[in-house]
Amino acid sequence: MSNEAKCPFHHAAGNGTSNRDWWPDQLDLSALHRHSSLSDPMDRDFNYAQAFEKLDLAAVKRDLHALMTTSQDWWPADFGHYGGLFIRMAWHSAGTYRTADGRGGAGEGQQRFAPLNSWPDNANLDKARRLLWPIKQKYGRSISWADLLILTGNVALESMGFKTFGFAGGRADTWEPEDVYWGSEKIWLELSGGPNSRYSGDRQLENPLAAVQMGLIYVNPEGPDGNPDPVAAARDIRDTFARMAMNDEETVALIAGGHTFGKTHGAGPASNVGPEPEAAGLEEQGLGWKSAYGTGKGADAITSGLEVTWTKTPTQWSNNFFENLFGYEWELTKSPAGAHQWVAKDADAVIPDAFDPSKKHRPTMLTTDLSLRFDPAYEKISRRFHEHPDEFADAFARAWFKLTHRDMGPRARYLGPEVPAEELLWQDPIPAVDHPLIDAADVAALKAQVLASGLSVSQLVSTAWAAASTFRGSDKRGGANGARIRLAPQKDWEANQPEQLATVLATLEAIRRTFNGAQSGGKRVSLADLIVLAGCAGVEQAAKNAGHAVTVPFAPGRMDASQEQTDVESMAVLEPLADGFRNYLKGKYRVPAEVLLVDKAQLLTLSAPEMTVLLGGLRVLGANAGQSRHGVFTARAQALTNDFFVNLLDMSTEWKPASADADVFEGRDRATGALKWTGTRVDLVFGSHSQLRALAEVYASADAQEKFVRDFVAVWNKVMNLDRFDLA
């Protein structure tokens, strides 16, 4: 018998063929089970916000300032300063953010984990994080990796003479990779046009992606698919940066500002570079890209394969990027690694060498740098920045702050002494509470008025759901606070049933106005609070209709934002294209509806049991978009019963597709053939999928009605308060 056959761990957990191998199209619920307490090493009562507030941030920054110019032999600093490396580290931590679903970004320190830690575009950032380890070790739990990566980028800028806009802490670390769709390609940096291409038609990038190739943060610096065409590259830049919420001015400022510092690395052919961290040997201890070219570091370093230093001041803030961009004509050349780049024609050697003070080089640029000169819109902005350095500095400071804080959500989450006082439109500002809040007696009185207003349980519940369910746990945007459901663009979204919504809001506004007018001492109720309170009243009434007396928790303190405080274009990305909880699809999609339901549930930070009980409850409460009857498996309308589950699992019903695409199904009596119900893929998956059926069976059982109501109320309350960071 071979030694391998004798191995006692040959059949260890995790080995062998997986369910995913057998059934690759099986609905995957794993995204709903990540980041549980089982993967978190911190004590259950650990509160990162409290720990950060006690941190001596000035001391951390002093240590970071010292680190910038303390070059280590195992990874020497370019020009004697790590600033450029750390700016790239922070940029690439934040730069994965995308507006379509709010995923990516710096908020959880995901750069530490696969796949991001091994993306080609993040090559050698493992060294940057390892340089930071002594500081992280020193301050421990008081500063997360997520905050430290961004703070280090800020300090890098400040140490090189740049005045930043500010810094906010509050990014708590997670301890495992996020389940994010980064594309379908099976090869790093696969070019467009392949079988798994993210592009279609006239170079239309697949949603929700925001990078041009697998393993890149934004664009290919050599140009589209390596084609060194600055004008074509500008199209890619504009598309990808817009998908990260950056306009043309912010884009120019970020590229030019970031490329004022440091250099790229392409001393030799990429064939000299070893595997990325996740593929490297144990002895590398989490480091990757070990190079056999020369010393493998310093002047011999290979990262992107490009060998470019943009300015003669690579460790000092200046306007030299634009001076060089417009001061020379440029000719195409190749780096020592064979990558396309550009060199200034007939130029003197004025650019310092990163390691040899006796050497100088001609100015060099990337294809994507030249886009700032040869794209007409970018050129206009670039020339203004060239002529007005103060405007450039301010634009870069603001764009850098936006880049590094875009996924943090509202200002209520910002921590620390360097939070800027200025309120910015992209932060989705909401006025601070400036009046006494309603008390328990007021809550009871308002509920009674709402229930006597003529609005149905369905109208109350669906309106509150429409307001609250815009929340995204990814970038902490959306939610009921602000009452933006009454403003453009939310009031006009198809999923929100604009005509019904207008009726409900008008009724609630009349109740609010009457209540506020009768108060003394300045007490008021906001429409945002009243929308949620009305939904809670609807749930209580539905439970009563089912024979259960419950009190749905309610915490006042929401305020109403104005239209002027709402960026319509920015808010538009929150529009639900699919909301399985309302049985809503705006269009026909390649991705099955049940997959989109799980995606929505994950953005709402729901577990599989929470998703299950919530959907079953919303169906019987009549919360479907357009008053659709699909999935309303009950004869007791607007009563909070477990009928959805009971009737879905009833074996006297036979289900068959009602259309060729199997998006809608008919449930008929097995004996008579009479039509009993209709349902969508989202409805039937709770009887088809083995895990979801197991959950549905819990709520369909004879003893489950009370538990069902209790669990529904709990998850309803959770969703209504997802954006209430003031309650944390």
Swiss-Prot record:
PROSITE patterns, sorted: PEROXIDASE_1 (PS00435), PEROXIDASE_2 (PS00436), PEROXIDASE_4 (PS50873)
Primary enzyme class: oxidoreductase
GO MF, one annotated term: catalase activity
Catalytic activity, reaction form: H2O2 + AH2 = A + 2 H2O; 2 H2O2 = O2 + 2 H2O
Domain of life per record: Bacteria
Posttranslational modification: Formation of the three residue Trp-Tyr-Met cross-link is important for the catalase, but not the peroxidase activity of the enzyme.
Keyword Nucleotide-binding: no
Keyword Cell cycle appears in the UniProt entry: no
GO cellular component labels: cytosol
Keyword terms, alphabetized: Heme, Hydrogen peroxide, Iron, Metal-binding, Oxidoreductase, Peroxidase
Cofactor binding note from Swiss-Prot or TrEMBL: Binds 1 heme b (iron(II)-protoporphyrin IX) group per dimer.
Transition state stabilizer, annotated site positions: R88
Active-site residue numbers: H92 (proton acceptor)
A biological-process GO annotation: cellular response to hydrogen peroxide
Covalent link Tryptophyl-tyrosyl-methioninium (Tyr-Met) (with W-91), residues: Y218-M244
Enzyme Commission number, as recorded: 1.11.1.21
Cofactor(s) listed: heme b
Subunit organization: Homodimer or homotetramer.
Protein name, UniProt field: Catalase-peroxidase
Organism: Burkholderia thailandensis (strain ATCC 700388 / DSM 13276 / CCUG 48851 / CIP 106301 / E264)
Gene that produces this protein: katG
